[in-house]
Amino acid sequence: MGKYIFNNHALLDTKEGVLKSGFQVLVEGNRIVEVKKGQINSPDAETIDLGGRTLMPGLIDCHAHVFIAQFTDNQSVLPSEMTARSSTYLREMILRGFTTIRDAGGADYGHKMSVERGYFEGPRMFVSGRILSQTGGHGDHRGKADFCSCANASMGVSRIADGVDAVRHAVREEIRHGVDQIKIMAG
């Protein structure tokens, strides 16, 4: 993990809502370790001169869908292409300043681990896996002629769970698959 000191920047103070100068910021790996007015003493850190640019904490997107760009795509686009697309979306999010995202349905543990292991460049992810919905609910994207009783809908992006026992089972399955939270689309 790298160790960096950022200097020569306008530091955004998010509590006061102002830009401040004369500060240095020490980052180790993906963590801000120290923010100090004046010099930070860390001889093993690489110093990066930001040339007067603005430095701010990473943004957090609390409702993203990196795996499903359009729900209608799920009917005609294979999961492998959707995963390839998600790598582009994740990289673009980093470039826009997002360092953490909460994916609210679609992305799973494999997407999260692809970022953590460096296969994809992207922000830290908290994933929901498959969206839970009841038959005919907001997350049931099956076509009117689709009478599948397999509990999956929309290429596995959502899952149908009717009744308490089915919901309990669906939640346990999603947790078993490594999700960080459960997304429910009822109604």
Map each language-model feature to its residues:
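Divalent metal-coordination and catalytic microenvironments
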Residues: 9, 25, 30, 52, ...
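Hydrophobic/aromatic beta-strand patches that form the interior of the parallel beta-sheet core
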Residues: 6, 46-48, 126
